[in-house]
């Protein structure tokens, strides 16, 4: 009897090993998904090397990347003409423009087969500003509460161990920090004194001279002057929770937050999926922000999405800064 149980157990292990080999080396797209998702995380890049060599990883990343539009944002293209209409170009345009009189924002549910999340339309971009944490350990809800923010999303990437924001941070037209590095392409993402979303690869001095008021450094840039970036494969950042900031030509700002890692049944989204959503809602300029467990949306001091990080559901990471609406 003991021998039979042992035989069954060994057979089970063999079956598991064979199944793993088939998944890792035979199932289409598993390699791309595993490598790109692993290397885009803050702490688990080494996962990619569990199954694949450095040569495999390099090849996959070469074939999965974002080719950004090589243009400066045309700041004068933003018109700030976004009155309600009697007819709309699409159901998505209607979702944005059909709102209550005097509304500051509108929350729109995003639901597709493999992912879900939220889009917030901000009708007065002059109410958007960058808020910073007072100390390492403050969550988005804590930042929003101290700032009396109506809407808030996460912004910069950051050093997980020490909490400082990666890359340049501009607030009130001054460079307030410049630590670490930005490894996701893009550049400075922020608003000018005229409340236009500016995306620029220039340094802080150049950006401020052009009117940059508040900004963080991240990317990639997904849309510039209405032209979407070219996405090779899945874009090189895999499938995960995402946060995006965008602006339509009519001046309306879009905060997009997509859940991932199985939260609420949402697997997450890649760069192709983000551009699909942004194009539907007529984003004219758009940039990816920090994602993964950092992707968080708070409205009126209530956590709206389901951030899933190292400690499970609805666990908010401490953040260095946030985009808020006051």
Where are these regions (language model features)?
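Conserved hydrophobic/aromatic beta-strand scaffold that supports enzyme active sites
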Residues: 117-121, 188, 221, 244, ...
